[in-house]
């Protein structure tokens, strides 16, 4: 393991540099560090060590020139007297040469010395340090050591080197704080020696350790040096995982800690690996040990590894071995993985089961029927092993001495195989035969099969034995009837003492009082039948009918061969009938029974002898003798009267052994394999347990065996003795009955080959199991406080501490069953298995609970539940409490979320109670905004909770991750509620009454939106107005669509990407727009369009203009399609020549941010260019823009039509004054064009509408200048509420014509209830625009690009203020306003029309609109031509020089001889031959009337330039377009439709004559009816000019004619005609008021009306006499009357039109002045007004009556004392 060791800090530079620029190169020699200074290589330090006082020590300083040039330098001697060198002198070193300079050191005392030698060169100075030091100790080691990460309670180490770099031998000792230690801690280092020190880090807790270790060194004087030791300790965290298949019941995705081996064959071992995962960053030493359990358990699980180290963030494979021993046993064990320090334990559970063979016989009996004596019969017997475990089987029969024999009586049956055995029947006597043969199987219970058959002879023909007889016999045996011979049973049957049941089995007569059913035969277990035979044990299933004694006998050594004593054999008849015993002769066997047959009376015995006749010495003999006993009456079938009385014979067997080995002769050594288990299978107390053993003979000789049963009487072994043929095997079954739980050892001596020396002791252990259940926590279960109504689940573990499966059942008191439950309540625990049960506590009150539960255990399943049964008590302690949940923030606003994107936040839930709460969250969604409620109600939930249910511990909080994903551009509101999870409310399907509001979350789904805020043009498109440009680019439709929600097809590719494989990419957008760049002649400047993109949304947006090439994927050449369509070729030509360009093509806009985009179209090729460009907003709209531009030939007349269809503004039917509307034409050519409108279709429409002029063209012909826009005026007057269409041909003289469809819609305002059409002057998306959008080279800008006056009454004045800003820093600009047409000049006024704006200055311009009396829709393009003042001055200067030169050339000339000769070649034929010739003429530049471009400027050739001085061209202006829109209405229409807006406008009242002439209705009627007026309206410009000139001449003559003036004056002074008195009173009053303003009266001329002194009226003295008082009162009254008359005169003056116009002009000029002053900063319109307190008025003694007249601001003061006033005066005052 590597450690990071930091080195010593660098020593200070011994050289003292005197100047900069020295480049030092370290030398490669380690003995002496060298440096290079300006090409001189020299040692940096000379050091003296080991010097003595009184002696000189000389060292040499070598200087070497490593430069390629000769170096010159000088030096200064050391400053002290202790270092001496030669006298300084100049040094010159050739390249590669060296110089040795001796330095002598002369010490005078013992101390350290230091000095230097300074060398000087032209480049600078450098020095060499001279140092002499005393011998001193010095150790060198790293300053800091970093140790690797270490686990707590573990250790890590690293090493470092300590080196003695001093001059003395030194000792060292380390002082190291815990948890670090050093090895060795102390030592001795000689000079130059070094040693390796190991640092050991042994942390006891997790921490970052940063300590200082101190090293003391030195002999006489102790010195110290420190080292920093850094290390970090972390806690290890280990987990166990079982790779591969998941355990049943395990949760997917989690680590598995249960290792399942499944079923493993008995006697085999299986290994599986588990992973120990180290989740920490440190290596983790750990111990693997078995969990503590009783010592009696035979460990079937084992692991060879007990200690290991798991690498950091790694894993360790651990092999576990499973070797089961007992078939059918389920094994469970636990291993614990404990890190060093026992910080935490990880438990690995291992389960497995043992499987053995599963052998079965296909039939339970083999029937040989009957054969004759001397014959044999063979039948087949199938034996199968359905398990995959090999099975050892053995039929317990000796075929050599039996009438039944098998071809393979023993063998191995492989897994899942079937073996067919041949069974042969060779009878020796004419009797019936039956033998029940046991088939022993190792690791399985024995199997039984019945062999039976009958033998007939000539004289004896017994009854044929059949399978039914065996069944009846077993039933009769149970009923105790087989001890009677068949003849007696027949008699009893005849006498009625016996009956037959339904199966024809015999039965005794039933007893009358007790109605019990007869006994039936039941199959006993094979083990019980095998052991309880009355021979091997004292117990028997049924009493024997015939017994033989002994059943086994060992003759021992029989030497000599002839001295073998016969064995007396006793056969006893236990029946009540006479029986016959017939022994099967064993031919060739050494054992014989005499006599072969014999009859035995009832209840009597008979003696037989077994003779042993060996034939060979030193041999082993073993055999089994077979005999059959039967009722003698069965010898002849005729003796049998009833078939049911037939009783099968009983088989008698004797096992015999003997040997003929001599006394001193060793027996054959047996070769065998013995498979014996170590322990008996576990059982309950006083229960039999069985196991099997296998003894295999692997030798070539027979083996005899004998088990000394008397040596271990507690264990039964069967068979006790026998023999095994070579290659065969013997299966033993052992049985014992343990009575207590103390382990008991059993030793069985097994003697082989009848020799005591070949005795094998079989050692087994047995132990009875008692019920033992381990409860966790000493039988106590604690619950945390639980909210009432809710439930809490706790894990509680119970463990089976026995080797047997244990059944358990929990019982809870009925009163506690509603509060407490357990799952599972009953079950089965496998041996040593621990089960975690789920206990649920559901309190119903706020109180503390102490509950009790009982678990009953037993070996049977289910466990018996009774007080006498073994049980364990469990105490449960819990508490009920109240609890609620609240949100930390009751309202959360996530703001704007991109539609389709995710945004998450954390919702903090707080639980302030003492109990944990399990909650269920529910969400309700509310979508609001401009949407259909029924449509959005079916939307899926746009809010997703990370988890909708969970648990919050007491006094804590939980975090719930909330993710929202809005699907619409609407406002979302989610109300989150919670319900406490109770048994009544298990899931989200709870009732609303259980829901509690928690919090509210809001979010707004938004799309990334952009819009076009402004657009302007330049280059060849500079003459296009902004409104026309807006329509050409379809920006209204584009902006309107950009505000909608994107279609799903537009989101196919959310971000700009290359997705097309062809040159023309597929279209996914539902909208396609035309981007029309207009038209221009070839070679013109490119048409530039500047668009201002604004992010009007609330989220950032990324946009891009994608050309077809930007959407195509890069493909290999072989994949490209070589056949290109004309459209593809056209697009490739456009892209290759870059006819269309966009800069920049992409960008990102933050909310509210703007960016200008420049689009251009180059006019390099004649024709129409089309290019589809995709405007893509990431996660938003995708719009296809069809870029279109037209290039025409020079001098070609071309009018650009924006579209072939024009929509007129809808007009209400019945409108008396329909407005004039405009259709625009743009001249994209270089010459003036004439257009003419063909009116035939309009005439047809008028004829179809009852001669009503629906469409009226006011300008049927006209001309358009190059690069400008022409207007065609239309009047649309619908007759019905419908849509009108008319196709109008527009002819271009000398050019192409176009058919334009004009569409107008008439509507009924009463039916629709709207007058909104009047209000729609501009489309909703047309705004004022942004002033930030400028074209390249623009020096000035307007504050507004569009002005909308809205709806205004006719003949009123409306003004707007526009500022012209000079954006240049240092150049003044000159501006001039011009309008597009004569009509615009009449209705629009601009003040000032021209001027100069200083740098960074601005000029206010007032735009005034005054309709001319004809209702119209005004759309004017005001153009402000801006020039740089410097360029104009330069132009004027150049022009003056050109004019002076022109004048000079007019009077000066030069005469040459050459001119005389050239005179004859003059071009003019009529020219006179002159001797003299003038200078080259001065002439104007031939300028074509077309837009100038960089490719079209006519440059003069050098030859022409030398002869012609071209007139200077004026500078090209910068055109600033100002669009003015308005709609004028007649006064009646405006008042009826815009009543609230009417008071805002000043309506000038014309005179009577003007009213009669200018009245709109009269004028409109005359215009509509008078054909001459229509002809005048359709007149050409030249005709109108003629009429205008004639009228000007007439009016001028009238104004200059004095006689006309006198006649007019006389007509005004004529008396009033007599008939003028015949008029209405109101008219007379009106005329009187109108005359009052002009005719003076006596009252108005009276000078007494305004008699005042110092601003106050004179007051009458109160001290006058009473008569004077009355006179004064009358005078005061007259004064009041005079004031009243004066007031009436003022009111009449105010009603005059001239007065109103004057006031309006004053107010307008005042407001304009205020705005101008405010723009200059001299007036602050938003400042707070100042309040000035006026002094109080002086007190007057005379109380006055104050009254104020209506409509006047003057006041009259009348004396309060009115006692002397007459009633008439009072009444006049009241009036």
Curated annotation (Swiss-Prot):
Comp. bias intervals (Polar residues): 1633-1645
Main location group: membrane
Residues passing through the membrane, by range: 84-104
Domain (MSP) ranges: 1331-1460
Keyword flag Transcription: no
Region: Disordered, residue numbers: 1627-1672
Membrane topology: Single-pass membrane protein; Single-pass type I membrane protein
UniProt KW keywords: Cell membrane, Cell projection, Cilium, Cilium biogenesis/degradation, Cytoplasm, Cytoplasmic vesicle, Flagellum, Membrane, Transmembrane, Transmembrane helix
GO cellular component: acrosomal membrane; acrosomal vesicle; cytoplasm; plasma membrane; sperm flagellum; sperm midpiece
GO BP terms, alphabetized: flagellated sperm motility; sperm axoneme assembly
Family: Belongs to the CFAP65 family.
Function field: Plays a role in flagellar formation and sperm motility.
Protein name: Cilia- and flagella-associated protein 65
Species whose genome carries this gene: Gallus gallus (Chicken)
Lineage of the organism: Eukaryota, Metazoa, Chordata, Craniata, Vertebrata
Gene behind this protein: CFAP65
């Amino acid at each position: 393991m590597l450690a990071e060791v930091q080195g010593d800090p660098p020593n200070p530079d011994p050289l003292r540099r005197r100047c900069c620029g020295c480049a030092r190169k370290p030398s490669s020699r380690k003995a002496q560090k060298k440096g290079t200074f300006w090409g001189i290589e020299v040692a940096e330090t000379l050091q003296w060590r080991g010097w003595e006082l009184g002696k000189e020590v000389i060292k040499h300083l070598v200087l070497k020139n490593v430069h390629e040039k000769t170096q010159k330098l000088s030096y200064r001697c050391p400053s002290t007297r202790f270092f001496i060198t030669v006298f300084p002198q100049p040094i010159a070193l050739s390249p590669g040469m060296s110089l040795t300079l001796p330095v002598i050191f002369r010490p005078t005392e013992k101390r350290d010395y230091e000095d230097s030698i300074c060398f000087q060169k032209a480049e600078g100075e450098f020095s060499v340090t001279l140092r002499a030091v005393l011998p001193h100790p010095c150790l060198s080691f790293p300053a800091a050591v970093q140790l690797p990460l270490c686990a707590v309670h573990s250790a890590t180490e690293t090493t470092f080197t300590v080196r003695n770099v001093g001059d003395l031998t030194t000792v060292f000792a380390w002082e190291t704080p815990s948890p670090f230690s050093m090895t060795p801690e102390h030592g001795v280092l000689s000079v130059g020696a070094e040693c390796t020190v190991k640092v050991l880090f042994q942390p006891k807790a997790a921490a970052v350790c940063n300590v200082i270790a101190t090293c003391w060194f030195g002999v006489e004087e102790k010195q110290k040096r420190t080292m920093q030791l850094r290390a970090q300790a972390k806690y290890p965290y280990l987990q166990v995982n079982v790779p591969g298949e998941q355990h049943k019941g395990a949760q997917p995705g989690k680590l598995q800690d249960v290792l399942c081996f499944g079923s493993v064959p008995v006697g085999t071992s299986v290994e599986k690996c588990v992973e120990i995962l180290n989740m920490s960053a440190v290596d983790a030493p750990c111990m693997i040990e078995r969990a503590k359990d009783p010592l009696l358990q035979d460990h079937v699980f084992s692991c060879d590894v007990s200690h290991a180290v798991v690498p950091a963030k790694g894993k360790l494979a651990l092999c576990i071995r499973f070797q089961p021993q007992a078939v059918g046993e389920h094994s469970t064990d636990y291993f614990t993985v404990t890190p060093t320090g026992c910080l935490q334990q990880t438990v690995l559970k291992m389960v497995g089961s043992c499987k053995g063979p599963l052998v079965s016989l296909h039939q339970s009996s083999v029937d040989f029927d009957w054969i004759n004596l001397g014959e044999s019969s063979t039948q087949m017997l199938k034996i199968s092993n359905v398990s995959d475990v090999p099975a050892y089987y053995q039929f317990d029969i000796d075929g050599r001495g039996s009438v039944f024999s098998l071809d393979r009586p023993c063998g191995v049956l492989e897994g899942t195989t079937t073996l067919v055995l041949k069974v042969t029947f060779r009878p020796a006597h004419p009797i019936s035969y039956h033998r029940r043969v046991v088939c022993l199987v190792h690791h399985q219970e024995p199997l039984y099969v019945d062999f039976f058959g009958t033998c007939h002879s000539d004289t004896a023909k017994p009854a044929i034995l059949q399978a039914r007889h065996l069944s009846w016999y077993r039933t009769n045996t149970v009923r105790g009837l087989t001890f009677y011979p068949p003849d007696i049973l027949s008699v009893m049957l005849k006498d009625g003492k016996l009956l037959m049941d339904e199966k024809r089995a015999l039965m005794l007569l039933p007893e009358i009082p007790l109605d019990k059913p007869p006994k039936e035969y039941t199959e006993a277990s094979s083990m019980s039948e095998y052991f309880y035979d009355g021979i091997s044990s004292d117990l028997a299933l049924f009493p024997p009918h015939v017994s033989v004694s002994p059943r086994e006998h060992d003759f021992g050594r029989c030497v000599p061969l002839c001295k073998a004593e016969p064995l007396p054999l006793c056969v006893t008849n236990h029946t009540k009938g006479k029986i016959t015993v017939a022994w099967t002769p064993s031919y060739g066997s050494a054992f014989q029974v005499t006599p072969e047959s014999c009859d035995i009376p009832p209840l009597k015995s008979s003696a037989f002898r077994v003779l042993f006749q060996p034939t060979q010495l030193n041999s082993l003999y073993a055999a089994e003798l077979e005999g059959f006993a039967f009722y003698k009456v069965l010898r002849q079938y005729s003796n049998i009267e009833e078939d049911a009385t037939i009783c099968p014979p009983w088989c008698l067997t004797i096992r015999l052994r003997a040997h003929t080995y001599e006394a001193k002769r060793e027996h054959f050594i047996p070769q065998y394999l013995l498979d014996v288990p170590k322990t008996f299978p576990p059982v309950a107390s006083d229960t039999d347990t069985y196991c099997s053993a296998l003894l295999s003979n692997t030798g070539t000789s027979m083996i005899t065996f004998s088990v000394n049963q008397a040596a271990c009487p507690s264990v039964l072994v069967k068979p006790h003795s026998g023999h095994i043929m070579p290659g065969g095997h013997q299966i033993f079954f052992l049985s014992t009955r343990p009575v207590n739980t103390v382990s008991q050892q059993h030793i069985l001596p097994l003697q082989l080959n009848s020799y005591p020396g070949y005795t094998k002791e079989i050692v087994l252990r047995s132990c009875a199991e008692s019920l033992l259940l381990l409860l966790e926590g000493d039988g106590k279960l604690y619950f945390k406080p639980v909210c009432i109504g809710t439930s809490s689940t706790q894990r509680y573990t119970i463990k089976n501490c026995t080797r047997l499966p244990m059944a358990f059942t929990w019982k809870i008191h009925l009163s506690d069953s509603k509060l407490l439950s357990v799952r599972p309540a009953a079950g089965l625990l496998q041996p040593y298995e621990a089960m975690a049960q789920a206990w649920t506590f559901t309190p119903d009150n706020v109180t503390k609970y102490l509950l009790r539960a009982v678990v009953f255990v037993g070996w049977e399943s289910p466990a018996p539940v009774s007080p006498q049964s073994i049980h364990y008590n469990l105490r449960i302690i819990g508490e009920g409490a109240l609890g609620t949940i609240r949100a930390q923030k009751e309202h959360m606003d996530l703001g704007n979320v991109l539609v389709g994107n995710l945004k998450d936040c954390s919702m903090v839930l707080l639980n302030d109670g003492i109990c944990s709460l399990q909650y269920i969250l529910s969400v309700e969604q509310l979508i609001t905004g401009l949407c259909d409620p029924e449509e959005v109600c079916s939307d899926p939930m746009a809010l997703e909770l990370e988890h909708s249910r969970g648990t919050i511990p007491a006094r804590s909080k939980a975090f719930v991750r909330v993710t929202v994903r809005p699907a619409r551009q609407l406002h979302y509101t989610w109300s989150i509620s919670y319900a406490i999870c109770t048994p009544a409310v298990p899931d989200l399907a709870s009732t609303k009454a259980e829901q509690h509001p928690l919090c509210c979350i809001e979010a707004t789904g938004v799309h990334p939106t952009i819009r076009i805020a402004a657009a302007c043009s330049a280059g060849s498109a500079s003459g296009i107005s902004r409104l026309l440009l807006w329509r050409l680019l379809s920006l209204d439709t584009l902006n309107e669509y950009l505000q909608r929600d994107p279609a799903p097809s537009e989101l196919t590719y959310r971000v700009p990407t290359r997705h097309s494989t062809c040159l023309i990419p597929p279209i996914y957008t539902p909208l396609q727009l035309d981007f029309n760049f207009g038209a221009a002649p070839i070679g013109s400047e490119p048409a530039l369009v500047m668009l201002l993109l604004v992010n009007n949304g609330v989220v950032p947006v990324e946009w891009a203009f994608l050309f077809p090439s930007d959407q195509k994927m890069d493909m290999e050449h072989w994949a490209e399609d070589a056949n290109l369509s004309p459209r593809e070729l056209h697009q490739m030509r456009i892209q290759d020549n870059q006819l269309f360009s966009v800069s920049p093509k992409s960008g990102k806009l933050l909310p509210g941010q703007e960016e200008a985009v420049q689009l251009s179209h180059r006019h390099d090729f004649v024709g129409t260019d089309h290019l589809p460009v995709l405007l893509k907003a990431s996660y938003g709209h995708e719009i296809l823009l069809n870029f279109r531009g037209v290039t025409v030939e020079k001098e070609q007349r071309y009018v650009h039509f924006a579209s072939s269809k024009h929509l007129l503004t809808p007009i209400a039917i019945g409108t008396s004054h329909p407005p004039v509307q405009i259709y625009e034409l743009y001249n994209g050519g270089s010459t003036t064009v004439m257009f003419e409108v063909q009116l035939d279709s309009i005439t047809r429409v008028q004829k179809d509408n009852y001669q009503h002029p629906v469409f009226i063209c006011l300008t049927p012909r006209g001309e358009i200048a190059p690069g400008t826009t022409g207007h065609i005026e239309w009047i649309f007057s619908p007759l019905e509420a419908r849509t009108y269409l008319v196709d109008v041909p527009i002819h271009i003289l000398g050019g192409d014509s176009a058919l334009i469809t004009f569409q107008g819609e008439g509507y009924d305002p009463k039916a629709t209830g709207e007058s909104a059409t009047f209000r729609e002057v501009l489309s909703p998306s047309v705004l004022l625009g942004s002033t930030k959008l400028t074209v390249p080279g623009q020096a000035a800008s307007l504050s507004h690009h569009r002005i909308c006056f809205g709806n205004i009454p006719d003949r009123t004045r409306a003004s707007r203020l526009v500022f012209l800003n000079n954006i240049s820093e240092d150049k003044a600009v000159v501006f001039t306003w011009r309008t597009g047409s004569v009509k615009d000049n009449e209705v629009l006024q601009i003040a000032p029309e021209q001027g100069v704006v200083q740098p960074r200055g601005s000029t206010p311009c007032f735009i005034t609109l005054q309709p001319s009396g004809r209702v119209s829709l005004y759309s004017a393009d005001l153009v402000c031509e801006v020039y740089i003042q410097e360029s104009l001055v330069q132009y004027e200067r150049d022009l003056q020089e050109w004019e002076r030169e022109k004048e000079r050339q007019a009077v000066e000339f030069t005469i040459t001889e050459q001119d005389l000769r050239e005179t004859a070649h003059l071009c003019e034929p009529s020219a006179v031959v002159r001797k003299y010739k003038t200078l080259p003429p001065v002439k104007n530049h031939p300028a074509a009337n077309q837009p100038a471009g960089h490719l079209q400027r006519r440059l003069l050739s050098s030859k022409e330039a030398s002869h012609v001085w071209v007139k200077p061209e004026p500078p090209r202006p910068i055109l600033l377009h100002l669009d003015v829109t308005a709609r004028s209405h007649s006064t009646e229409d405006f008042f009826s439709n815009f009543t609230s807006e009417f008071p805002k406008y000043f309506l000038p009242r014309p005179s009577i004559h003007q009213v009669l002439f200018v009245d709109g209705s009269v004028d409109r009627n005359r215009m509509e009816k008078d054909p001459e007026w229509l002809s005048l309206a359709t007149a050409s410009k030249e005709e109108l000019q003629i009429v205008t000139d004639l009228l000007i001449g007439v009016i001028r003559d009238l104004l200059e004619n004095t006689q006309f003036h006198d006649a007019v004056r006389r007509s005004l002074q004529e008396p009033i005609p007599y008939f003028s008195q015949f008029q209405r009173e109101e008219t007379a009053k009106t005329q009187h008021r109108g005359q009052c303003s002009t005719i003076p009266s006596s009252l108005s001329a009276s000078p007494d009306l305004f008699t005042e002194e110092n601003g106050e009226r004179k007051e009458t003295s109160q001290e006058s006499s009473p008569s004077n008082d009355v006179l004064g009162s009358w005078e005061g009254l007259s004064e009041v009357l005079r004031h009243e008359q004066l007031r009436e005169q003022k009111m009449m003056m105010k009603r005059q039109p001239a007065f109103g116009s004057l006031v309006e002009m004053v107010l307008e000029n005042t407001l304009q002045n205020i705005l101008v002053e405010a723009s200059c900063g001299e007036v602050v319109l938003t400042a707070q007004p100042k309040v000035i307190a006026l002094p109080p008025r002086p007190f007057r003694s005379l109380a006055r009556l104050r009254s104020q007249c209506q409509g006047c601001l003057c006041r009259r003061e009348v004396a309060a004392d009115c006692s002397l006033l007459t009633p008439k005066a009072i009444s006049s005052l009241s009036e």
